[in-house]
Regions:
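Transmembrane helix-boundary motif of multi-pass solute transporters/channels
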Residues: 8-46, 56-57, 69, 201, ...
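Hydrophobic, membrane-embedded alpha-helices of multi-pass small-molecule transporters
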Residues: 10-20, 25, 88, 92, ...
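Transmembrane alpha-helical segments of multi-pass small-molecule transport proteins
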Residues: 10-13, 17-19, 47, 82-86, ...
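Membrane helical hairpin/interfacial module
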Residues: 34-126, 133, 284
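TM-loop-TM module centered on a large, flexible mid-protein loop between adjacent transmembrane helices
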Residues: 68-74, 233-284, 291, 300, ...
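Hydrophobic, small-residue-rich membrane helices and short re-entrant helix-turn-helix hairpins
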Residues: 134-145, 177-181, 201-230, 247-260, ...
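A generic transmembrane alpha-helix motif of multi-pass inner-membrane proteins
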Residues: 157, 164, 361-438
Length: 438
């Protein structure tokens, strides 16, 4: 095996591990349950938002210079600061607490159902705090064992669930399986994570000797394809298994309960225990890694006025308080955050993907601004704000019934921003010419 192929495989598996979080396992089966016999359309929706778009995040950052700063510079010189701050707050208040909640409900309570929730949650974040404080390399070594372990267990579940399905998918009368799964894919948070991990990931590629843009981009693309296939097998398989349970489990079954119920029917109690242990340990390593990264970021943001260890403790205390709400409540209360951040992130991604063909910086500014406005409006409605005018206005926008109300505003913002920027540039040029003439 030549060096390029070997490195592509190694980096591709590493990228798969970065995106493949134990906390995300609960989403595909639930989407399959909702889609029923329309599971294939749901797989396509999840493929785009939960797999393809996050991986494109890494590719686009590589192709636009290798950093989120360069990707977002056309929007505003300091836009990336606010954008990264928003993502970091998401990790602090959503992703990290969710790992604790999933570890408790799918890990500890799956084996010991009578244990009070507060006990494993406090223990989980105490361990997180201990290891994150030390920045121990032991966690990296454990992670290298746990990711393959979890992957093997899931592969067994997926293969068994596909080869000997528990039942046939039934009709569920879901109107828009593609868009439901597409929007459901927001909950993985992987696109937001891709903007955070891209620099580290790309630095590793350069460290391996791929220093030119062409070489770096080639390895990135190869690795992305490998990661995409791995995620498609796992997420697609879990979604299909959820669909096979659509005639057994009632709609609205809680996500953790559904996944544990499916695994019990496929592999019995042994499968549940194996999955619970792997998920518990994988959630722990994810929590430690995220806590360390977020604490580092806030420590730098404070110019070292507040210590790294203090931020670790703050994050863990917040993690305990939010994790005690439970997985379902965390998902419910964080939905508005995704409704705002994800459309903006997708627009930034698409602008970066086609950056060579973008007429001017006004296109970036207009597209992102219009997307932000409509996304905030939709988020307000999603949390129960009563506004007949706002609701009627959004319902008039094409694709709003499918959850894509931001597409047309983004296009209009792109066009209007481009025209305004062009006119301003023309006016400046004319003024400059007059001054030179005078």
């Amino acid at each position: 095996m030549n060096k390029s192929l070997k490195d592509s495989l190694t980096i591709g598996l590493a990228l798969f591990a970065m995106f493949f979080g134990a906390g995300n396992l609960i989403f595909p089966p639930n989407l399959g349950l909702e889609a029923g016999d329309n599971w294939f359309l749901a797989v396509l929706g999840l493929l785009f938002s939960g797999i393809l778009i996050p991986i494109l995040g890494i590719i686009v950052i590589s192709y636009t210079g290798g950093s989120i700063i360069k990707l977002t510079r056309p929007i505003s010189k300091n836009f990336y600061r606010w954008f990264i701050l928003a993502i970091t707050l998401f990790l602090s208040l959503v992703a990290i607490p969710r790992t604790g909640a999933v570890a408790t409900e799918m890990g500890i309570q799956a084996i010991f159902p009578k244990i009070p929730t507060v006990v494993p949650v406090i223990l989980f974040f105490a361990i997180t705090c201990y290891f994150a404080n030390d920045k121990s390399n032991v966690i990296d070594k454990i992670g290298n064992i746990l990711t393959p372990m979890l992957g093997i267990i899931l592969l067994v579940i997926v293969l068994k669930g596909i080869m000997t399905p528990i039942a046939s998918p039934v009709e569920t009368h879901l109107k828009n399986p593609f868009s439901t799964a597409f929007i459901g894919g927001y909950q993985t948070g992987d696109l937001l994570a891709s903007f955070m991990i891209a620099t580290i990931f790309l630095s590793d590629i350069v460290h391996k000797g791929y220093t030119s843009d062409k070489a770096r981009n080639k390895i990135t693309l190869n690795a992305a394809i490998i990661a995409l296939l791995g995620l498609l097998i796992v997420y697609g398989g879990l979604l299909y298994i959820g669909a096979t349970g659509s005639g057994i489990f009632p709609q609205g079954t809680e996500r953790v309960e559904l996944l544990l119920g499916l695994v019990t029917m496929i592999l019995g109690r042994v499968g549940v225990v194996g999955l619970a242990i792997a998920v518990l340990l994988a959630c722990l390593t994810t929590s430690i890694g995220l806590t360390s990264s977020v604490a580092d970021y806030f420590n730098e943001l404070s110019d070292n006025k507040i210590s790294y260890k203090t931020f670790v403790r703050i994050i863990c205390i917040l993690g305990i308080l939010i994790a005690l709400l439970g997985v379902e409540k965390i998902i419910f209360i964080t939905n508005p955050v995704f409704v705002v951040l994800y459309p903006i992130s997708i627009v930034i991604l698409l602008l970066g993907l086609f950056h060579k063909y973008i007429p001017n910086h006004g296109s970036y500014k207009g597209a992102v601004f219009f997307t932000f406005i409509i996304s905030v409006a939709e988020a307000l409605l999603s949390i129960g704000v009563k506004s007949t005018l706002l609701s009627n206005l959004i319902s008039m926008i094409p694709f709003s019934s499918q959850g894509f109300e931001w597409i047309l505003p983004a296009i209009l913002g792109f066009i209007s921003g481009s025209l305004v920027f062009k006119e301003k540039s023309k006016t400046k040029e004319e003024s400059k010419t007059k001054e030179e003439y005078i």
